[in-house]
Amino acid sequence: MFRAHGSRSLGRGLASSLAAASRGSQTCTARSQFRALASVSVPPPKETTDLDQISTLPNGVRVASEALPGSFSGVGVYIEAGSRFENGYLSGVSHLVDRLAFKSTTKRSVEDMQEAVESLGGNIQCVSSRESMMYQAATFNSAVPLATELLAETIRHPRITDEEMGEELATAQYEIEEIWKKPELIIPELVHLAAFKDNTLGNPLLCPAERLPEINKQVVRGYREAFYRPERTVVAFAGVPHQQAVELATEFFGEMEARSPLSRSGSETSLESGSSASSASSSKSSLFGSSVLPLWNDPALNPTGTVPNPMQPNLTSLHLAFEGVPIASEDIYALATLNTLLGGGGSFSAGGPGKGMYSRLYTNVLNQYGWVEQCQAFNHSYTDSGLFGIQALCLPGKTQAMLDVMCQQLRGLTLSTGFQALGQQEVTRAKNQLRSSLLMNLESRMVELEDLGRQVQVHGRKIPVQEMCHKIESLTVDDLRRVASDVLGGGVVNAGKGSGSPTVVLQDVFDHTTTSTKRMTWEEIQERIYRWGLGRR
């Protein structure tokens, strides 16, 4: 994620150039009649990285700041935790830790905490992801100390009462039931589950329902003791001078106890929080062989028949994914551009006609096949792996046709000749769209804050937006074709040494209008994909 800076300076620079050209067009006689005006040397505009600073406290907490002026400031705490680090004992705990944020602490009751949060007049939240727990607040400049204090309290000094645990477990149970009724929410989770086989990135982000009775205060405290450590913590400030940022971080996080880092034994991470939490997931994501996770619209699969589930929509959902590149890879820019180039969306757009009309999936799929309800590319990037592919919704009975259409669109990215091959015009358009999207996203203080904190957490530094835009702009058609061939051909080699085979998640709907409908087996799906030259056998 990036933020646009210097556009006003660029405008001034263009204006100066035009003025100079105008003065140069005057005749020599006119210039000789007037004394030349005094000129002032204008310093070049500051790079945003000139305003970025990173310090490390004695206990290992990293403090990052970006002193961009504005009426609002942001403060965030990013902890290297999340579902990818969970083992069997801690499975699903990240979901509950997320929900327990901003409850009672050793200094405030839950009512006092809520009142303090409301007094900020901004936005405060906790978000759990696969690789990070993110506590963030955007508020008025004058309220930054209070916001930092509240974040520190909920991170370092939560009470976690029995009543709070009971309430959040009940809420989590309701969330789980509701999300499983929404294919657009649960199927991306199942794509990760199928691709990474219940390890690291395949661990469920949503707490499994069967785990809820086993999670209590002791389990949550074990999770916090294992991962809430200073060396795994980044405190980021947006719109705050670095000296003030260091002072606030020292005041509220400087006393976090520095302990020995998690020890690694083979491919596992040892948790020292208790005997029950003896090991965590492997630190390297791996895709183990080709996999398919069929999701029938039935309460239980019966080999002799099916029972329709009325809670599910009457559409077939299909996800086709391949292992992508890590977020630190130089090829991430090409893969993000390919994702933008494919684009896509729904057959009905609330944004009005023409929304996304120049993307490949919109023009070649949604505009061509009336039985396709939705078709969109996706790209998930993580520290050591990723997933790239297409998701689609179509009418019942069109599964085979939908799979062929998706494979055709992906294969077209790898061709060097023919009408499906990548063209310079569409590549340029995709690069411009990607840069525009990235720059506009960072107009949000919260996005800017998360960008700073996560980059320091992942890269150890803030990558300048100018550097990212330059890398996007310098991409060629050959670069995109090469990356597409590597990813879609199963040639990506990451730390986990994946198989290169495709991952398919299918939620097939039985077509009641015909008796000849036959569901595809995994062998049929796999062979169909290989026939298009995708994946590695």
State the predicted function of each range.
Residues 33-59, 65, 290-293:
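Short, Gly/Pro- and small/polar-rich lid/capping loops
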Residues 153-160, 253-262, 408-419, 529-533:
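A common structural junction motif
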Residues 2-24, 28-31, 38-40, 234-236, ...:
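C-terminal regions of mature proteins
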Residues 217-255:
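Non-catalytic, conformational "gating/processing" segments within enzyme and secreted inhibitor domains
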Residues 50, 69, 74-142, 181, ...:
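M16/MPP (pitrilysin/insulinase) zinc-metallopeptidase core fold and M16-derived inactive scaffolds
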Residues 2, 12-41, 76, 106, ...:
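Acidic/histidine-enriched segments that form metal/cofactor-coordinating
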Residues 64-69, 76-81, 261-364, 372, ...:
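His/Glu-based metal-binding/catalytic segments typifying zinc-dependent metallopeptidases
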Residues 60, 77, 95, 135, ...:
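Divalent metal-coordination and catalytic microenvironments
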